Regions:
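Conserved catalytic core of the tyrosine transesterase superfamily
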Residues: 1-256
Length: 256
């Protein structure tokens, strides 16, 4: 965080002064605030199928009449495009082109705007969702593609609660479920891409710049992190196949 960066800068100056023979104080490592970093959870194909089936059956809420239609679409968008949760829930109408499938991701972490293209099946899903969204008079003035009641985008907490509701519904009667976050959909996306490249015998480090650009990482170190997850992922998630991504996109007929 910001405080940790400030302490690092002060320590750097202190170490320089000490090296030149001046008196200076250097903060001990224990002084920096501890920041919890949850371990990424990589969903199996079976878990994803159950999760999206639960999203498809998300209950209707009269206080939020569009929510049950938003949930199945926004979580698929985050997963299949590898978005950060905030990029999905705060997506604006003017930044998604349902004719070309292009999605402009802006106002992002590290200010790295990027243009991505959705799968054709996902474009069809978004078009089907856009019909009731556009017809809902209470949301017409909202600039967001996934509007919450009142026209703003969903808060981070509300978004997380909807995801947890889907996760629990996907695993009825199971106690002590693994702790998962919306962000884990992005982790699974990256792992699936790397798994595919591994199967294709590609040089992962040569391909990393492409994944880095697509996911909007600031530098390669963030992208390299997913390679370190791969061995554990391959052991625990033996059924991870890239082609299985297609199975979570519901078929949309031409007239729907």
């Amino acid at each position: 965080g910001r405080m940790k960066n400030c302490i690092s800068a002060i320590n750097f100056l202190g170490q320089y002064l000490l090296a030149t023979g001046e008196n200076a104080y250097v903060f001990p490592d224990s002084f920096a605030p501890y920041r919890y970093h949850p371990h990424p959870y990589v969903f199996t194909d079976e878990e994803l199928s159950r999760l999206f089936a639960a999203a498809d059956s998300f209950p209707y809420c009269p206080q939020s009449p569009l929510r049950h239609k938003i949930v199945p679409v926004v979580f698929r968008l985050i997963y299949t495009c590898g978005l950060r949760p905030g990029e999905g829930r705060a997506l604006k109408k003017r930044h998604i082109n349902l004719d070309t499938g292009e999605v402009f991701i802006t106002d992002t972490k590290f200010d790295k705007d990027r243009l991505i293209v959705m799968w054709d099946d996902l474009v069809s899903v978004c078009r089907k969702y856009d019909e009731p969204r556009a017809a809902a008079t209470s949301f017409r003035k909202s600039e967001y593609f996934f509007p919450a009641p009142g026209g703003n985008c969903y808060s981070r907490n509300a978004f997380s609660q909807m995801f947890q509701q889907c996760w629990k519904a996907a695993n009825p009667g199971i106690h002590n479920l693994p702790r998962v976050r919306v962000y884990d959909l992005r982790h699974r996306f990256a792992s699936a891409v790397l798994n595919r490249w591994t199967d294709e015998k590609r040089d992962l480090y040569a391909m990393l710049p492409y994944l880095r650009a697509y996911m909007g990482h600031y530098d390669l170190s963030a992208t390299e992190h997913y390679i370190h997850l791969l061995p554990d992922n391959l052991v625990k998630s033996s059924g991870v196949f890239w082609a299985a991504m297609e199975s979570i996109i519901p078929e949309v007929k031409e007239n729907e």
